[in-house]
Amino acid sequence: MTALSNMKCEACQADAPKVTDEELAELIRMIPDWGVQVRDGVMQLERVYKFKNFKLAMAFTNKLADLAEDEFHHPGIFTEWGKVTVTWWSHSIKGLHKNDFIMAAKTDQLLA
């Protein structure tokens, strides 16, 4: 399979299929630092990134904002001193789509 970070997001409509359990098991192995959370019945990907100070955390947040705009897929972002929590899910389908895994991999690359 092509590296997730090399893929582009596709338009996700309300009738797009959520990832299957089998797809979830395969895709989550490709982004090992991410976890799956369920909030209000909605499955989401989440990772906490740690930084030495607030300025570095904010710089990462701004890079992530640019990436999200470029891909037209937007995460939940919680920025605080030394830490940024990023949550990906597809709002239109209220769950996980392959786009979320692509964006998680691209988010990881922002640290490179």
Curated annotation (Swiss-Prot):
Top EC group: lyase
One term of GO molecular function: 4-alpha-hydroxytetrahydrobiopterin dehydratase activity
Coiled coil region boundaries: none
Pfam families (UniProt xref): Pterin_4a
Biological process, per Gene Ontology: tetrahydrobiopterin biosynthetic process
Keyword Lyase recorded: yes
Name of the protein in question: Putative pterin-4-alpha-carbinolamine dehydratase
Species annotation: Shewanella baltica (strain OS195)
